């Protein structure tokens, strides 16, 4: 997914530019022609005033999953772990202890390998068999739709490099 072509980002730029549609269209045109754009100093200043950003790599993601599992008995997925970790960075830097709600939309079962490794378990299987291992270790119920995959045949096993995607898709459609 190319987040630079996100309608949410475009709406944010529109808001931060003082609803300057010509400026935002210029960014989108530049993105289309050059593959990137740089926003104005005014938009950068507005972003810095309203937002705080951080970074969470794989190691810190795993540590956060393990910490929340140990401290709260709650198994979080990798995406939620990044959000939690960056929130903790924000609190440490700013001292802001405002109550925070995380709306976690992913399941730890979507990332079994990473979650198992994070909680100190070596993944011992592959594919849907990992669902059982994570369930045995965590006690967290496997989501119904993922559990329904057990025993089903794999429909697709083709992988493609980015530069080959167009050809692979066209060949598949023949």
Describe the role of every protein-language-model region.
Residues 1-174:
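PLP-dependent amino-acid enzyme catalytic core
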């Amino acid at each position: 997914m190319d987040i630079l072509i996100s309608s949410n980002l475009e709406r944010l730029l529109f808001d931060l530019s003082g609803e300057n549609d010509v400026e935002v269209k210029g960014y989108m045109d530049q993105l289309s022609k050059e593959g990137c754009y740089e926003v104005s100093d005014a938009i950068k200043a507005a972003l810095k005033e309203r937002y705080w950003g951080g970074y969470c790599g794989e190691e810190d993601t795993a540590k956060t999953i393990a910490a929340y599992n140990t401290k709260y008995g709650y198994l979080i997925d990798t995406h939620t772990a990044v959000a939690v970790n960056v929130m903790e960075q924000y609190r440490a830097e700013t001292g802001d202890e405002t109550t925070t709600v995380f709306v976690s939309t992913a399941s730890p079962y979507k990332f079994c390998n990473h979650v198992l490794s994070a909680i100190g378990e070596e993944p011992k299987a592959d594919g849907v068999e990992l669902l059982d291992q994570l369930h045995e270790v965590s006690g967290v119920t496997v989501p119904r739709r993922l559990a329904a995959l057990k025993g089903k045949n794999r429909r697709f096993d083709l992988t493609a490099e980015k530069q080959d995607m167009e050809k692979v898709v066209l060949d598949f459609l023949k």
